[in-house]
Amino acid sequence: MRPWAGGTAALLVLAGVLSSAALPGAGGRKKVVHVLEGDSGAVVVQTAPGKVVTHRGGTIILPCRYHYDVAAHDPDEIRLKWTKVTEPMAFEDVFVALGAARRAFGSYRGRTALQEDGFGDASLVIRNVTLQDYGRYECEVTDELEDDTGMVKLDLEGVIFPYHPRLGRYTLNFREAQQACREQDGILASHDQLHQAWLEGLDWCNAGWLQDGSVQYPISRPREQCGRKDTPVGVRNYGYRHKDSEHYDAFCFTSNLNGKVYFLKTFRKLSYAEAVQACKDNGAAVAKVGQLYAAWKIQLLDRCEAGWVEDGSIRYPIVNPRARCGGREPGVRNLGF
């Protein structure tokens, strides 16, 4: 690939992994839940209102407590089940407990356990949180024919980044968009994440796939070339599109880095292949697009020099805008492929 005429260096990710796990209950992560005791003797479940927040690599507790009439029920016959809501009527098994028996499922094996902080505590501890853990979880407590459920939303600190590959804009169907985000250290963003990014000022005039199969884009500054100047600000929604035959960009989401992005200064211009080798020689690898965005947003990486990133594009992160440094707004500048 031809190097950028202005000269490039390489943006890197350290090979050494930095510890980012949070202690359970630390930093205000754990919410206190008070249980409402009913008079009927039926199982009553209460979870935390709103959401709990962590970051990739952290440890989080999904709060859930239950109450029931001990005289009417054997504690060993109480079944506790955690599932993740993947679609409006679709669920993924996460963790089940019955008496002393415990079982975790799929990617949650080895990372989940009950908190068991006293009687009636069904709270679930998730360690080494991944991007894929984001979403809504259902806590279900069952005793024979009596049961109750509660819902907990797990949110992640992170950053949205719009993405299209070398082939250009509007070239990705839904599954290709999912893959593109994964390859750049992200996942497809949710509507809630995109809406929050819009509230924080994200303005992007190209529609992209979201996690639920809808296509949307955020507008903070209406203009003629972007859906007309007289239309209101907001997240514009094309609705649910055909996942195989229709093509758009992608809105990806990524979170905390297990490492550090830094700029490797070189004495001359580098081609992409030379940048890859320079990173390798330095004990690292060329940063992915999502890693660069995370370094900009979370680690406040600010560099007014462009460098290669993993997909073959040339970018640079700006936290403090200044003269002759890519405009008046902070962000990750893209000089193209």
Predicted regions, residues:
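Extracellular disulfide-stabilized recognition modules
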Residues: E157-R175, C205-N206, Q225-L270, N320-E329
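N-terminal V-set
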Residues: V70-R109, D192-Q193, G290
